[in-house]
């Protein structure tokens, strides 16, 4: 994921948690914060409760790939995505569908593109 698409600083994460709103499904919690920019920025969080480092890194890779696929349809806001335990059992296509579902629930899904 390109640097300009990432939330990196603690203050950026805290702003999204504090001022944004959250939407969830069984696999993911997504915090959204409206922002004036041309593309979205995202921060990923996978707790140590979800498994060892290999499993957590796999989950982050799946989430990043799903975001790459969903990019044209996601509104240009700031997001923090937190993975829940059931997400570790999902395949790539299931992760993509689950994130798409939670983005639609958050009303940030823009129908267009690919």
Swiss-Prot record:
Q: Cross-referenced HAMAP family, in alphabetical order?
A: RNase_P
Assembly, in brief, is:
Consists of a catalytic RNA component (M1 or rnpB) and a protein subunit.
Which species does this protein come from? Exiguobacterium sp. (strain ATCC BAA-1283 / AT1b)
Per UniProt, what is the name of the gene that codes for the protein in this document?
rnpA
- Recorded catalytic activity of this chain's protein: Endonucleolytic cleavage of RNA, removing 5'-extranucleotides from tRNA precursor
Gene Ontology cellular-component annotations:
ribonuclease P complex
**Role played:** RNaseP catalyzes the removal of the 5'-leader sequence from pre-tRNA to produce the mature 5'-terminus. It can also cleave other RNA substrates such as 4.5S RNA. The protein component plays an auxiliary but essential role in vivo by binding to the 5'-leader sequence and broadening the substrate specificity of the ribozyme.
Q: What's the short name of a Pfam family annotated to this entry?
A: Ribonuclease_P
EC numbers, comma separated: 3.1.26.5
Q: Does the keyword tRNA processing apply?
A: yes
Question: What family name appears in the similarity comment?
Answer: Belongs to the RnpA family.
Q: Which GO terms describe its molecular function?
A: 3'-tRNA processing endoribonuclease activity; ribonuclease P activity; tRNA binding
Example GO biological process: tRNA 5'-leader removal
EC top class, as a word: hydrolase
Q: Which InterPro entries match?
A: Ribosomal_Su5_D2-typ_SF, Ribsml_uS5_D2-typ_fold_subgr, RNase_P, RNase_P_CS
Q: Which UniProt keywords apply?
A: Endonuclease, Hydrolase, Nuclease, RNA-binding, tRNA processing
Please report the name of this protein according to its UniProt entry: Ribonuclease P protein component
């Amino acid at each position: 994921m390109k640097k300009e698409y990432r939330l990196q600083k603690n203050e950026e994460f805290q702003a999204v948690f504090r001022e944004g709103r959250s939407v969830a499904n069984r696999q993911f919690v997504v915090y959204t914060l409206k922002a004036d920019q041309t593309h979205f920025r995202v921060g990923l969080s996978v707790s140590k409760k979800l498994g060892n480092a290999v499993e957590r890194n796999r989950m982050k890779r799946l989430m990043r790939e799903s975001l790459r696929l969903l990019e044209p349809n996601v509104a240009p806001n700031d997001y923090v995505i937190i993975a829940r335990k059931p997400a570790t059992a999902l395949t790539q296509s299931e992760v993509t569908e689950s994130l798409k579902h939670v983005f639609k629930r958050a009303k940030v899904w823009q129908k267009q593109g690919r």
